[in-house]
């Protein structure tokens, strides 16, 4: 009878031995590259403390690095190993490199281990569709986006006849996702519940699954990925996206050819047209579905967060509401309140408020992230080996130009006043303008190609809210809620509700 237990004993022993070896190897193989530059917080001597500080208070670490080293390069210890941070001035050195030499996309993919989370795919078709086709058609989409925004508020929000608490993180996810889908996959697909759920959950699976898988050494991730539930869901997300898109793609194929009718004006059509023009035979329905997921990931969550930050700033500073509301009403008075392209351009105070909100609550306290695809030498002689990820330490308010006014105060009309100084300034200081002093969207020729689309969406949604609702915080909230940090990412406090009340 004892012999019957031998296979079980051997299996248990082998499993235990494997777990032990994997655990030991994971620690032994985790040898981060170090650089000959000072380490912020090195005096503590405890790497685990420094890693925890980076996760919870990267803003304080980068501030400490700035105060200690000013214009010098420094490094910070992160859970992924040392990370190099450059003073803002070195953005001038990097901005002229092509994306094939210093890649923001590759840096982002590395941060989220894109080989496994599937966001490491850099497509010229997708880039062209965003950079050229989307930007070229922005004006034609204002009405469509506003229509989807209004539909979402009517169907997804409570009546708000009296002050009603709203979970902005939840509700605005739907608003931004549906407004974006109107441009990405067209109508009626933009209202497909399964598509909206698939496209919004994918980004969450990427971020959560990536963080879990990063706990394993790269040598062990090919096996470890199968023990991370989010990795399984990511593969399912891609398959489901394809299944959901196929009926729409087949419907379009079945439409009778009509030389007098315009093709569908959305991201699906632009990508298909570009694939045909370039003769890219690898572009199929599966590739189209994958790129749609990547585009949604890039567009939805950062836009939602920017709107939440702006609404928190408005609720904490109600004195801005009436001037902004008056500007919106004045801009749209000739169209009975219906938004058009030129109206967004006229909303200079709202644009200024958005930019000031972003200045105080940027998506990240370290921007202009690049992975060196070739060896790069900076103007001071510092050598960046190929494969190294660097970022610029750009969210230092003390570096604000003197003529901008008090850098630490919140002045919602700061950039409105700057734009009105002289005729030459009228087109400067806009929310979507990437400059040396404002790098939230990057800098140089490879600045975020979707920034104009994001700017329009944020402005349309904020204009709708200001035109239809009063907002305020609950009485228990004093001032503007403090942001949370996750590594270099700046997050609005998800525990706070904003009260909405419909304007009569």
Curated annotation (Swiss-Prot):
GO terms for molecular function: heme binding; iron ion binding; monooxygenase activity; oxidoreductase activity, acting on paired donors, with incorporation or reduction of molecular oxygen. Its main location: membrane. Pfam families: p450. It is found in: Membrane. Signal peptide: none annotated. Its cofactor is heme. Heme binds at residue 448. The chain crosses the membrane at residues 4-24. Its EC number is 1.-.-.-. The keyword Signal does not apply. It is a single-pass membrane protein. Pathway: Secondary metabolite biosynthesis. The keyword GTP-binding does not apply. One of its GO terms (biological process) is secondary metabolic process. Disulfide bonds: none annotated. Keywords: Heme, Iron, Membrane, Metal-binding, Monooxygenase, Oxidoreductase, Transmembrane, Transmembrane helix. One of its GO terms (cellular component) is membrane. Cytochrome P450 monooxygenase; part of the gene cluster that mediates the biosynthesis of the brasilane terpene glycosides brasilane D and E. The biosynthesis starts with the activity of the terpene cyclase braA that converts farnesyl pyrophosphate into the sesquiterpene alcohol trichobrasilenol. Subsequently, trichobrasilenol is glycosylated by the O-glycosyltransferase braB putatively using UDP-GlcNAc as sugar donor to yield brasilane A. The latter then undergoes two rounds of oxidation performed by the cytochrome P450 monooxygenase braC. Belongs to the cytochrome P450 family. This is Cytochrome P450 monooxygenase braC.
């Amino acid at each position: 009878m004892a012999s019957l237990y031998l296979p079980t004993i051997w299996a248990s022993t082998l499993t235990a031995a494997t777990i032990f070896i994997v655990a030991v190897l994971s620690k032994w193989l985790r040898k981060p590259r170090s650089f000959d530059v000072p380490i912020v917080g090195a005096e503590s001597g405890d790497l685990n403390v420094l890693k925890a500080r980076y996760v919870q208070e990267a803003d304080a670490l980068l501030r400490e690095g700035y105060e200690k080293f000013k214009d010098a390069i420094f490094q910070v210890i992160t859970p992924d190993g040392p990370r190099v941070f450059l003073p803002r001035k070195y953005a001038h050195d990097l901005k002229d490199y092509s994306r094939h030499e210093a890649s923001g996309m590759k840096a982002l993919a590395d941060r989220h281990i894109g080989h496994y989370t599937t966001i490491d795919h850099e497509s010229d078709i997708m880039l062209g569709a965003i950079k050229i086709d989307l930007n070229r058609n922005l004006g034609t989409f204002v009405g469509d986006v506003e229509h989807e925004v209004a539909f979402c508020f009517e169907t997804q929000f409570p009546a708000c006849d009296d002050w009603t608490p709203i979970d902005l993180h939840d509700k605005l996810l739907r608003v931004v996702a549906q407004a974006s889908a109107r441009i990405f996959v067209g109508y009626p697909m933009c209202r497909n519940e399964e598509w909206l759920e698939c496209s919004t959950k994918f980004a969450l699976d990427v971020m959560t699954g990536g963080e879990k898988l990063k706990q394993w050494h790269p040598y062990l991730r090919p096996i470890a990925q199968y023990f991370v539930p989010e990795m399984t869901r990511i593969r399912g997300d891609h398959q489901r996206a394809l299944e959901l898109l196929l009926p729409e793609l087949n419907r379009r194929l079945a439409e009778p050819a009509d030389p007098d009718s315009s093709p569908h004006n959305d991201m699906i059509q632009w990508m298909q047209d570009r694939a045909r023009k370039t003769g890219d035979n690898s572009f199929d329905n599966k590739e189209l579905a994958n790129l749609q997921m990547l585009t949604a990931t890039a567009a939805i969550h950062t836009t939602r967060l920017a709107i939440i930050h702006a609404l928190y700033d408005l609720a904490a500073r109600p004195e801005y509401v009436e001037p902004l509301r008056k500007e919106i009403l004045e801009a749209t008075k000739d169209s009975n309140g219906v938004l058009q392209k030129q109206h967004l351009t006229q909303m200079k105070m709202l644009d200024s408020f958005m930019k000031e909100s972003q200045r105080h609550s940027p998506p990240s306290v370290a921007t202009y992230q690049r992975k060196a695809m070739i060896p790069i030498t900076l103007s001071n002689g510092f050598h960046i080996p190929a494969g190294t990820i660097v970022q610029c330490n750009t969210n230092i308010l003390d570096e604000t130009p003197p003529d901008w006014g008090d850098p630490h105060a919140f002045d919602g009309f700061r950039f409105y006043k700057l734009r009105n100084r002289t005729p030459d300034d009228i087109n400067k200081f806009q929310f979507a303008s990437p400059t040396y002093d404002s790098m939230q969207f990057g800098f140089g020729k490879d600045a975020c190609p979707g920034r104009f689309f994001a700017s329009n969406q944020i402005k349309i949604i904020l204009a709708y809210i200001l035109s239809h609702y009063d907002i305020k915080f609950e009485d228990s909230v004093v001032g503007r809620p403090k942001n949370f940090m996750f590594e270099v990412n700046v997050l609005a406090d998800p525990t706070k509700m904003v009260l909405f009340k419909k304007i009569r």
